[in-house]
Amino acid sequence: MGLLYTRLKIFHFKEKLDSLPLNTGKIMPPVHIRIKPTNVCSHNCWYCAYKADDLQLGQDMQKKDFIPREKMMETIDDIVEMGVKAVTFSGGGDPFYYPYLLETVKKLSKTSVKFAALTNGARLCGEVAEIFANYGVWLRISIDGWDNESYSQYRGVSTEEFSKVMKNMEDFQKIGGNCYLGVSIIVDKKNALHLYDFIKKIKNVGVNSVKISPCVVSNNGINNNRYHQPIFKNVKEQVKRAIEDFANENFEIFESYHELDDKFNKEYDWCPYLQILPVLGADLNIYPCQDKAYNLDEGLIGSIKNQSFKDFWFSSKENFFKINPSKVCNHHCVANSKNKLVLEYLNADREHLGFV
């Protein structure tokens, strides 16, 4: 299998890259769209970025919001017609709590658009699991607690929920199909000492990969690093040992546990990635990324409440330049490293391109 986590995927879409600057006047469809169909989730994770008081992310999120069925079906039609390559369903809430998810992915399964989802795994069962197993490209399940008791404490759920999620993953793999099932472990001070055994337990369930990431506790990079400093060395050692002992051609361990930049300041004044991977929220608003979702003051680029996604997208190139990252994105940004690569590519001197 090729590289799953690489910042260079966008460079396979040269025409899209070259269309990004304002002065081209050209609007092409996004390559990938992240859709947040509902803000409902039955779990209450303490570190959830959309609920944390100390993070700008999700500050205007309303739990009751969801995308109406008719609007979702209209949007899927637009996505197919526009030539969008992929859709990821995520939160906000948990997409598997969206009442029309099954109908939505059934519709997508009859098209060329690839789809995936992020979920807590509690509802990964029944027909919707079969559709994802047979037609989805990947699923990633977020986990923190390492057993029934700890999982219950993390998420405010019953002490049976952890076993249920683990069984759902095991049963999902038994369906067959080509959907790549991964787990995302969000590391904090509570589970840091249990990572090695936890990764072994996850492998034994039969999933394809596990990703290790730090919880984000603040808009300030220094504060994030200060939180992780007491556990940092131990976590790195456990993950290294797990990779040596458990990783093979059937089980990938992707280590994304690292210190964050001390400063989140951005030195560029427009965001290329909002034209590549925009976010559609459950409130029917369009945002540049998941880090700016549900931030109406600084992250809103448009709405499909009274128009279709296609009509909004092609209405004006100016919509994509409303946000100045150097002024309003001085916080954690999932697209920052990708943006810098794209901008470096676009800013290369044309007279000197041959001098590789």
Map each language-model feature to its residues.
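Radical SAM enzyme [4Fe-4S]-AdoMet core and its adjacent flexible, acidic
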Residues: 2, 36, 58-60, 67, ...
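Secreted/processed peptides and extracellular or luminal domains of membrane proteins
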Residues: 47, 51-54, 233, 277, ...
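Residue-level signal for mature regions of secreted extracellular proteins and peptides
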Residues: 34, 38-41, 264, 282, ...
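Short cysteine clusters
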Residues: 41, 45-48, 271, 289, ...
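Flexible mid-to-C-terminal extensions adjoining Fe-S/redox cofactors in radical SAM and related proteins
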Residues: 3-29, 266, 285-286, 290-356
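Short, flexible helix/strand-to-coil boundary loops that buttress conserved ligand/catalytic motifs
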Residues: 49-52, 128, 154-155, 290, ...
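Conserved alpha-helical substructure of the radical SAM core
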Residues: 2-138, 229, 234-235, 354-356
